[in-house]
Amino acid sequence: MSGQPKRLMVMAGGTGGHVFPGLAVAHHLMAQGWQVRWLGTADRMEADLVPKHGIDIDFIRISGLRGKGVKALLAAPLRIFNAWRQARAIMKRFKPDVVLGMGGYVSGPGGLAAWSLGIPVVLHEQNGIAGLTNQWLAKIATTVMQAFPGAFPNAEVVGNPVRTDVLALPLPQERLAGRDGPIRVLVVGGSQGARVLNQTMPQVAARLGDTVTIWHQSGKGAQHTVEQAYAGVGQPQHKVTEFIDDMAAAYAWADVVVCRSGALTVSEIAAAGLPAIFVPFQHKDRQQYWNALPLENAGAAKIFEQPQFTVEAVADTLAGWSREALLTMAERARAVSIPDATERVASEVSRVART
C-alpha cells in the first residue's frame, strides 16, 4: 500500500479567488504523482474550469445563505445535511488521504464530511478577513493557513498561490527601469467589471491628458459604453477591452494598476511587483479593504474607499507619482509578496497526509 500515490480532494468553488489558487496547488501535487479530485457545485465556474485542467470533479448541491429569505433559512439545515451526505458518499468512494478547503460554500459540508470520516482537513483562507465557512471549519481542521495576517490569530501566513506566468515576470527593477513616456495605467474591474471604475477613469484621463496611457478592462457588455466615455472627453486613444486573457502580459505592460482588491488580485499585483490604487468592493465585512491594507502599509499602494474614489483624488494621486516613486512602490510590493505560496500550501498538505 505504501507505494500507492497519495490522494487529495480539493474543495473550492464559486469564484476565481477560490478556484485558481486551488488549481495551482492541485497541479503542483499532481506533478509529484498525487491523485487529485475536486468537490464543487454544478452551477458555478468550477464546473467548466476544473475539467479543462485535467481534474475530475464531483458535485454536491449547496449555495450561500446570506441575504436569503426566511423560508430558505428554515430549509438550510436540511440542505446542509443533504450536501454533507452527498460529500460523504463521494469521499467514501475516492478515499482521499487529506482534503484541502480553499473556500466557497462547498467547503462547509465537504469539510464536515471529511472530518466525520476521520480524513484530515487542511484549510487555506485567501482573504484578510475569514469567511463564515472557514471560521466554522477552523474549529475542526487539522491545519489552518492564511494568505494575509489577521484572518486567524495563530494561523501561518503563507500567501495566496498565484499563476506561474505572473511569478515568472521580471523583477520591477529590471522591468520598469529606463521606461519613459506617459505613465501606463492598467484599469481592471474583474471579469464583471466595476461600474465605479468605468465611470471615473475616463474623467481622470481627461484631467491627466497625454501624461498617461490607459488599458481599461471594462467587464462584460461595457466595452462600447466605456470607449464612448473616453471619446466623449477627448481621449479616444486609450485601449478598452471586455476581458484580458493574458494578465501576466498586462502586468508586464503596466506601471500602475487601478483595481478592486479581491484576494487573488492583491496577491498577483504583489507577486508582479506593481504599485496600485485599490478601490475595495463595499461589503459589510470590509474583506477587500483588509486584503489591500498590507500593501498600503508597505508603501506600495493607496486605498480609496468607494466614496473617496473621485476624479480629483485619483488624478491628483497619479499625477503626484513620478517614475522613481512608482519603481520604489513596485519594489515594496514585490518585497511583501510570498512567491512560494503554492509550495508552502502543498508542503503542508503533504505533511498532514504523512502523519
Curated annotation (Swiss-Prot):
Residues engaged in binding UDP-N-acetyl-alpha-D-glucosamine: T15, G16, G17, N127, R163, S191, I244, A263, L264, T265, V266, S267, E268, Q288
Q: Spell out the molecular function terms from Gene Ontology.
A: UDP-N-acetyl-D-glucosamine:N-acetylmuramoyl-L-alanyl-D-glutamyl-meso-2,6-diaminopimelyl-D-alanyl-D-alanine-diphosphoundecaprenol 4-beta-N-acetylglucosaminlytransferase activity; undecaprenyldiphospho-muramoylpentapeptide beta-N-acetylglucosaminyltransferase activity
Reaction(s) this enzyme catalyzes, per UniProt: di-trans,octa-cis-undecaprenyl diphospho-N-acetyl-alpha-D-muramoyl-L-alanyl-D-glutamyl-meso-2,6-diaminopimeloyl-D-alanyl-D-alanine + UDP-N-acetyl-alpha-D-glucosamine = di-trans,octa-cis-undecaprenyl diphospho-[N-acetyl-alpha-D-glucosaminyl-(1->4)]-N-acetyl-alpha-D-muramoyl-L-alanyl-D-glutamyl-meso-2,6-diaminopimeloyl-D-alanyl-D-alanine + UDP + H(+)
InterPro entries recorded for this chain?
GlcNAc_MurG, Glyco_trans_28_C, GlycoTrans_28_N
Which processes are annotated in GO (biological process)?
carbohydrate metabolic process; cell division; cell wall organization; lipid glycosylation; peptidoglycan biosynthetic process; regulation of cell shape
Where mainly located? membrane
The record ties this protein, via Gene3D superfamilies, to: Glycogen Phosphorylase B
Q: What is its EC number?
A: 2.4.1.227
Q: Which UniProt keywords apply?
A: Cell cycle, Cell division, Cell inner membrane, Cell membrane, Cell shape, Cell wall biogenesis/degradation, Glycosyltransferase, Membrane, Peptidoglycan synthesis, Transferase
Q: Report the membrane topology from the UniProt record.
A: Peripheral membrane protein
How would you classify this enzyme at the top EC level? transferase
Read off the Pfam families from this record: Glyco_tran_28_C (PF04101), Glyco_transf_28 (PF03033)
Q: In which pathway does it act?
A: Cell wall biogenesis; peptidoglycan biosynthesis
The Gene Ontology CC terms held by the record are: plasma membrane
Localisation per UniProt entry = Cell inner membrane
Q: What does this protein do?
A: Cell wall formation. Catalyzes the transfer of a GlcNAc subunit on undecaprenyl-pyrophosphoryl-MurNAc-pentapeptide (lipid intermediate I) to form undecaprenyl-pyrophosphoryl-MurNAc-(pentapeptide)GlcNAc (lipid intermediate II).
Q: Which PANTHER family match?
A: GLYCOSYLTRANSFERASE, UDP-N-ACETYLGLUCOSAMINE--N-ACETYLMURAMYL-(PENTAPEPTIDE) PYROPHOSPHORYL-UNDECAPRENOL N-ACETYLGLUCOSAMINE TRANSFERASE 1
User: Family per UniProt?
Assistant: Belongs to the glycosyltransferase 28 family. MurG subfamily.
- What protein name applies here? UDP-N-acetylglucosamine--N-acetylmuramyl-(pentapeptide) pyrophosphoryl-undecaprenol N-acetylglucosamine transferase
The organism is: Salmonella choleraesuis (strain SC-B67)
The gene is murG
